[in-house]
């Protein structure tokens, strides 16, 4: 938690300048660089990289 206050961001993306305080945030960010759309709508052809994009 203290990393949030200190400004220290030890996790860095190797594809852009993104930095963050924890590994899970980096893993989520790395999806933005991929072409994998693993979450699909059951009612249409929409697909997304992030599960929260399917929620109402």
From Swiss-Prot:
Return the Gene3D superfamilies for the record: Classic Zinc Finger
Q: Subcellular localization, per the record?
A: Nucleus
List the GO molecular function terms: DNA binding; zinc ion binding
Identify the domain of life.
Eukaryota
What cellular component terms from Gene Ontology apply here?
nucleus
Question: Mind listing the UniProt keywords for this protein, alphabetically?
Answer: Developmental protein, DNA-binding, Gap protein, Metal-binding, Nucleus, Repeat, Zinc, Zinc-finger
Zinc finger spans (C2H2-type) are 1-5, 11-33, 39-56
Task: List, in alphabetical order, the GO biological process terms annotated in this UniProt record.
Answer: segmentation
- InterPro entries listed in its UniProt record: Znf_C2H2_sf, Znf_C2H2_type
> Main localization of the protein?
nucleus
Protein family according to the UniProt entry: Belongs to the hunchback C2H2-type zinc-finger protein family.
Briefly, what is this protein's role?
Answer: Gap class segmentation protein that controls development of head structures.
Q: What is this protein called?
A: Protein hunchback
Organism listed in the record: Locusta migratoria (Migratory locust)
